[in-house]
C-alpha cells in the first residue's frame, strides 16, 4: 500500500539504519568504536552477502555480545514480495514492499551470458518523461543504499533455489539514479566489493536522463562502470517534448558533459533511444541522430517500447525499427536493437507498481 501515512510515520520512528548500507570500511570503523577487531567486518559481510542470512542469530562465528550490538544498531533489510511475475522467456518481475508501505520494482533478466538484474533507486520519479510509467504519481522518496542492495540480495536468494547467480546489473529501474547520487555510489561500491556481492564493475551499468552536474562528478569517480544516457531524441525541441528535463539541461550542454566524461575516463557511453511510433522513429530522425553523435565514442541501443496504458505512445512497426537501425549503420554509428524481454508481463518500467497503486485506490 502507498496511502498508509500513519504507518509510514510509525515505521520511520522505529527504523534502525540498514546494515546493507555500510561499506566494508564503514563496518570496520563501527567495529572499532565498539571495541571489536576490524577483521569481524569480513565475517559479517560473508554472512550477509555469501550466506545471505536474515537474522544475526545465524552469524554463529560472532560472539553473542557482538550479535546483540549489531541487532541493536542495524536492521537486516528485508523486502516483502507483493507480486512476482514470470515471463515465458524467463524474465521475472518483482514488486517489493518497503518498511514504510511503499513499493518498488526489480527485474531479473536471463541472457545467454548470465543473469542480469535491473534495480530501482527511488520510490517514484520526478523527471516526468512523457512515455514512462515510473513518473506516474511523482517522487515519494529516495531509497537508501541498503534498500537498493537488498533488491540484489532478495533476487539472489530466489536464484539460490536453482543454483544460479546474479552476474550483472543495470541501474535502470524506477527513479533517476543521479537524483540519489550518494546512496547510488555506496550501493555500487558494496555490490562491486569482493567481500560484498562481488559483481565486476564492467558488468554494471548506470543510466541517467541527463543531470549534467552529476555527469561531471561521475566522471571523477574511480569506477570502471558502464555509463548510459537516456537520449530518445536527436534534437532539443523533440527531446524537451519527450523528456521535460531537457528544458533544464539542454541537449548541447548534455553532449558537452558526455564528451568530457569520455575524455576523462576513456570509456564508451551508450545512448538509449526508445522508438515511439510517429514521434522519433523516422529516417530523418536517424540521420539527425547520426549527425549529433558524429565523432562521439558511443553505442546506440534502440529500444522497441513496451505499451503503457496510461501513456499515448504506440510501438514502432518492426520494419521501421530495422530501417532506423540500417540508417544509423550506414552512417557509421555502432547500433543494436535491444532484445525484448518480459513482453507478456507488466514489463515497462514502473508499470507493475502503477497497476498495484491503481488497484489500491479502487
Curated annotation (Swiss-Prot):
Keyword match Iron-sulfur: yes
Cofactor(s) essential for the protein: [4Fe-4S] cluster
Gene Ontology molecular function terms on file: 4 iron, 4 sulfur cluster binding; metal ion binding; rRNA (adenine(2503)-C2-)-methyltransferase activity; rRNA binding; tRNA (adenine(37)-C2)-methyltransferase activity; tRNA binding
EC class: transferase
S-S pairs: 118-349
Active site: 105 (proton acceptor), 349 (s-methylcysteine intermediate)
Domain of life: Bacteria
Catalytic activity entry: adenosine(2503) in 23S rRNA + 2 reduced [2Fe-2S]-[ferredoxin] + 2 S-adenosyl-L-methionine = 2-methyladenosine(2503) in 23S rRNA + 5'-deoxyadenosine + L-methionine + 2 oxidized [2Fe-2S]-[ferredoxin] + S-adenosyl-L-homocysteine; adenosine(37) in tRNA + 2 reduced [2Fe-2S]-[ferredoxin] + 2 S-adenosyl-L-methionine = 2-methyladenosine(37) in tRNA + 5'-deoxyadenosine + L-methionine + 2 oxidized [2Fe-2S]-[ferredoxin] + S-adenosyl-L-homocysteine
UniProt KW Iron keyword: yes
Binding positions for [4Fe-4S] cluster per the UniProt entry: 125, 129, 132
Biological processes annotated in GO: rRNA base methylation; tRNA methylation
Localization per record: Cytoplasm
Any one Gene Ontology cellular component term annotated for this protein: cytoplasm
Assigned EC number: 2.1.1.192
Cofactor: binding comment: Binds 1 [4Fe-4S] cluster. The cluster is coordinated with 3 cysteines and an exchangeable S-adenosyl-L-methionine.
Record-listed S-adenosyl-L-methionine binding positions: 175-176, 207, 230-232, 306
Domain named Radical SAM core: residues: 111-344
Keywords: 4Fe-4S, Cytoplasm, Disulfide bond, Iron, Iron-sulfur, Metal-binding, Methyltransferase, rRNA processing, S-adenosyl-L-methionine, Transferase, tRNA processing
InterPro entries for this protein: Aldolase_TIM, Methyltransferase_A, RlmN_N, RNA_MTrfase_RlmN, rRNA_lsu_MTrfase_RlmN/Cfr, rSAM
Record Pfam families: Radical_SAM (PF04055), RlmN_N (PF21016)
Stated family: Belongs to the radical SAM superfamily. RlmN family.
More about this protein: Reaction proceeds by a ping-pong mechanism involving intermediate methylation of a conserved cysteine residue.
Role according to the record: Specifically methylates position 2 of adenine 2503 in 23S rRNA and position 2 of adenine 37 in tRNAs.
NCBIfam families: rRNA_mod_RlmN
Protein's name in the database: Probable dual-specificity RNA methyltransferase RlmN
Organism: Bacillus cytotoxicus (strain DSM 22905 / CIP 110041 / 391-98 / NVH 391-98)
Gene that encodes the chain: rlmN
Amino acid at each position: 500500500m502507498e496511502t498508509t501515512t500513519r504507518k509510514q510515520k510509525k515505521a520511520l520512528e522505529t527504523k534502525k539504519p540498514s546494515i546493507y548500507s555500510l561499506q566494508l570500511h564503514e563496518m570496520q570503523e563501527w567495529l572499532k568504536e565498539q571495541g571489536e577487531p576490524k577483521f569481524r567486518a569480513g565475517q559479517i559481510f560473508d554472512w550477509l552477502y555469501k550466506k545471505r542470512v536474515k537474522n544475526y542469530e545465524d552469524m554463529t562465528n560472532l560472539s553473542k555480545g557482538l550479535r546483540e550490538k549489531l541487532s541493536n544498531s542495524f536492521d537486516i533489510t528485508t523486502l516483502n514480495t507483493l507480486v512476482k511475475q514470470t515471463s515465458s522467456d524467463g524474465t521475472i518481475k518483482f514488486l517489493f514492499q518497503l518498511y514504510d508501505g511503499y513499493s518498488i520494482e526489480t527485474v531479473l533478466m536471463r541472457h545467454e551470458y548470465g543473469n542480469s538484474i535491473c534495480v530501482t533507486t527511488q520510490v517514484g520519479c520526478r523527471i516526468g518523461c512523457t512515455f514512462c510509467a515510473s513518473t506516474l504519481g511523482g517522487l515519494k522518496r529516495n531509497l537508501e543504499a541498503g534498500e537498493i542492495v537488498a533488491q540484489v540480495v532478495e533476487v539472489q536468494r530466489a536464484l539460490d533455489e536453482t543454483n544460479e547467480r546474479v552476474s550483472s546489473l543495470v541501474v535502470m529501474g524506477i527513479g533517476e539514479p543521479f537524483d540519489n547520487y550518494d546512496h547510488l555510489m555506496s550501493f555500487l561500491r558494496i555490490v562491486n566489493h569482493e567481500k560484498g556481492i562481488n559483481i565486476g564493475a564492467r558488468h554494471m551499468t548506470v543510466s541517467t536522463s541527463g543531470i549534467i552536474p552529476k555527469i561531471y562528478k561521475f566522471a571523477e569517480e574511480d569506477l570502471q562502470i558502464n555509463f548510459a544516457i537516456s537520449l530518445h531524441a536527436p534534437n532539443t525541441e523533440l527531446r524537451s517534448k519527450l523528456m521535460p528535463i531537457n528544458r533544464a539541461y539542454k541537449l548541447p550542454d548534455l553532449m558537452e558533459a558526455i564528451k568530457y566524461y569520455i575524455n576523462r575516463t576513456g570509456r564508451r557511453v551508450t545512448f538509449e533511444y526508445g522508438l515511439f511510433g510517429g514521434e522519433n522513429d523516422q529516417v530523418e530522425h536517424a540521420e539527425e541522430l547520426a549527425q549529433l553523435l558524429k565523432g562521439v565514442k558511443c553505442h546506440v541501443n534502440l529500444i522497441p517500447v513496451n505499451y503503457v496504458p496510461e501513456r499515448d505512445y504506440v510501438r514502432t512497426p518492426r520494419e521501421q525499427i530495422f530501417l532506423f537501425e540500417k540508417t544509423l549503420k550506414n552512417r557509421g554509428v555502432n547500433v543494436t536493437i535491444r532484445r525484448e524481454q518480459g513482453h507478456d508481463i507488466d514489463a515497462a518500467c514502473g508499470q507493475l507498481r502503477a497497476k498495484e497503486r491503481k488497484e489500491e485506490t479502487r
